[in-house]
């Protein structure tokens, strides 16, 4: 097996997508190339437990650990969606010792566009 080349990136972007059923965290370099990613499902949670803030924190911890090994010290975070895991992912990166320089909220908000789906009973 060939050795994996060590990547050294001093700063990057973290994209967090929080849907009502799952949380996906991906890390990119400043030009947008994905370096690593994790979701509540890939970390080992299935079904109802994927929705929890704890599972989002575990996924964020996994990405934070990988990013720290790549030498990334500061990140800009882009949050998207209305799921429960947003605050937990921010805390996970802060507790991992990574400096968060900017937090952007890019949740799509319709200006009276399509009709939303019916609420579950």
From Swiss-Prot:
Record flagged with keyword Nucleus: no
PROSITE patterns: RIBOSOMAL_S11 (PS00054)
MF annotations from Gene Ontology: rRNA binding; structural constituent of ribosome
Gene Ontology CC annotation, any one: cytosolic small ribosomal subunit
UniProt entry keywords in alphabetical sequence: Ribonucleoprotein, Ribosomal protein, RNA-binding, rRNA-binding
Domain of life: Bacteria
Any GO BP: translation
Keyword Ribonucleoprotein: yes
Disruption of the gene: reported phenotype: Probably essential, it was not disrupted in a global transposon mutagenesis study.
Family: Belongs to the universal ribosomal protein uS11 family.
Subunit structure: Part of the 30S ribosomal subunit. Interacts with proteins S7 and S18. Binds to IF-3.
Protein purpose: Located on the platform of the 30S subunit, it bridges several disparate RNA helices of the 16S rRNA. Forms part of the Shine-Dalgarno cleft in the 70S ribosome.
Name listed for the protein in its UniProt record: Small ribosomal subunit protein uS11
Naturally occurring in which organism (per UniProt): Mycoplasma genitalium (strain ATCC 33530 / DSM 19775 / NCTC 10195 / G37)
Primary gene name: rpsK
């Amino acid at each position: 097996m060939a050795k994996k080349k060590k990547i050294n990136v001093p700063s990057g972007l973290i994209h967090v997508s929080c849907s009502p059923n799952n949380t996906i965290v991906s890390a990119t370099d400043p030009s947008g190339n994905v370096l690593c990613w994790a979701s509540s499902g890939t970390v080992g949670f299935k079904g109802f437990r994927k929705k929890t803030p704890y599972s989002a924190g575990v996924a964020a911890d996994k990405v934070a650990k990988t990013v720290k090994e790549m030498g990334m010290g500061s990140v800009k975070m882009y949050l998207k969606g209305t799921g429960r895991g947003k605050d937990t992912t921010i805390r996970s990166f802060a507790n991992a010792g990574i400096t968060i320089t900017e937090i952007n909220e890019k949740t799509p908000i319709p200006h009276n566009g399509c009709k939303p789906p019916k609420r579950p009973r």
